[in-house]
Amino acid sequence: MDLYNLKNNMLEPVDRESFKLEKDIQGLIENNVETLFNLEFISTEFTVGDFRLDSLCFDNENNSFVIIEYKKGSSYSVIDQGYSYMSVMLNNKSDFILEYIEKTGKSLKKNEIDWSQSRIIFISQSFNSYQKNSVNFKDVPFELWEIKKYSN
């Protein structure tokens, strides 16, 4: 879809740009996660066992954790990565609670969290059709969000 700026009743095309690095996407989202997703940012590059989670957030409305993963391009490993991260979260609940307490200074008990509402958000400049179709199943705890960058 093309975008235009309106100036003096004339349309000027807006050029699309690419994010050069995955970190550029990550920084933008982490700084604006409350505005974009109504989530509380907890931690960046959170490590649990052998896994490094890009962004850890908390959904105060649903009392659940949300992991955000960033992809520079369309990767084929989105769904298996999502299930791995969901498994890591559900098998290491105390690590997530401890990270929340350490980063926010607020108390949180295991029984206050609705683990069934936990989810993974993937953000990329594009996803392939297989990835888009794979999240159409009911109750799949994954969301795919495409991000676009435009000049000026």
Positions of PLM-derived features:
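Charged, terminal alpha-helix-loop-beta segments
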Residues: 1-152
